[in-house]
Amino acid sequence: TLCFTTDAGCRRNKINMLETQHGLSPIEEVIADARAGRMFILVDDQSRENEGDLCIIGEHANAQAVNFMAKYGRGLICLALTRAHTEQLGLEMMDRRNESRHQTAFTVSIEAREGVTTGISAADRALTIHTAINPHARQADIATPGHIFPLVARDGGTLVRAGHTEAIVDIARAAGCAPNGVICEIMKDDGTMARLPDLMDFAQQHNLKIGA
């Protein structure tokens, strides 16, 4: 979950408070939807990015899911991976200095080496995702640069960094799936970031669970 402290009990209490105050779904329901292959929304704290991301576990990220993210999320479509898997793929960090405000750990962008055309279509991006998350994937299976943007989740998950990257990996693990996922920030029609009231409306409109 995104909302955390280093003490598990305090973290659970804070999450319960947010769920009660804002009508968010219990994290257990979000995990159940994730396991079933449904998309969901994760929001972070107002003191952090104050944004919501469309999320889906990697194995369920088909062309329809990618198209939904591109059409309705409008943000950057990213693939959250563990450090071990990015090393298996031989992916280098986009910039080792990483001076971004929230230390978002981008690697170089990627494309499936085989089976894609220009790489940007929903089907091509879904193929790239599935190629990259294959447990036997190697550097030879991936070309760079490309149209999917991998993110490296911190070891230790949301107990170490309260980011969407770590949250989707934690949820995938909790759902009994491989620890990866696809995320995309949600923007409004006017190009500004969707905040919690907007995200609640968005979730209701598209029948999605929303968690913290």
Task: List the model feature ranges, each with a label.
Residues 15-211:
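Catalytic domains of riboflavin
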